[in-house]
Regions:
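A generic structural motif
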Residues: 44-46
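Core residues of folded domains in eukaryotic genome-function proteins
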Residues: 25-28, 37-39, 50, 75
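Cysteine-centered nucleophilic/redox motifs
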Residues: 3-32, 41
Length: 148
């Protein structure tokens, strides 16, 4: 990868490389895309029992409010995906969920929810039964975290 030779790249290249390295090291990792133009990684930390924000460009771990509080971004949609799942994780990254909801106008919320659910179920269907169970349990815990 040219990125490792030059050590120059944008957030997308760094997030792709970091996510791939995490997976190669045996971690569950997924790429996170923010519609206002930034990309980073989430890594599942077994000891924590949850997904952790990891931004290789900023060299930060588990500081999900960095973008709104530190950078002053007005996030709209933040979607995490891997070859096993896809999920709207916006709530993890926003300070005020109600204000965020007012900014989300690109697509109908119900349409987005249904389409993410359908895609997630297709990805889960490609997994072994034991993995499906783990993914479903993690998903339920994550939904509690995001909505609680």
């Amino acid at each position: 990868m040219k990125l490792f030779e030059t050590r120059t790249g944008r957030c997308g290249e760094w997030a792709n490389a970091f996510t791939a390295i995490c997976i190669a090291l045996g971690f569950e990792a997924r790429r996170v895309l923010d519609w206002t133009d930034h990309v980073w990684t989430e890594v599942y930390i077994e000891e924590w029992g949850r997904w952790a924000h990891a931004d290789p460009c900023e060299n930060i771990l588990d500081k999900p409010l960095t973008y709104e509080m530190g950078w002053g971004k007005q996030l709209t949609y933040v979607i995490a995906s891997s070859n096993k799942e896809i999920i709207d994780v916006t709530r993890r990254y926003v300070v005020d969920p109600l204000l965020n909801k007012m900014r989300r106008k690109e697509v109908n919320e119900k349409w987005l929810s249904i389409n993410l659910k359908n895609r997630r179920e297709k990805l889960w269907d490609m997994q072994e039964e034991e993995d499906k169970k783990i993914l479903f349990e993690r998903f339920c815990r994550e939904q509690e975290e995001l909505t609680g």
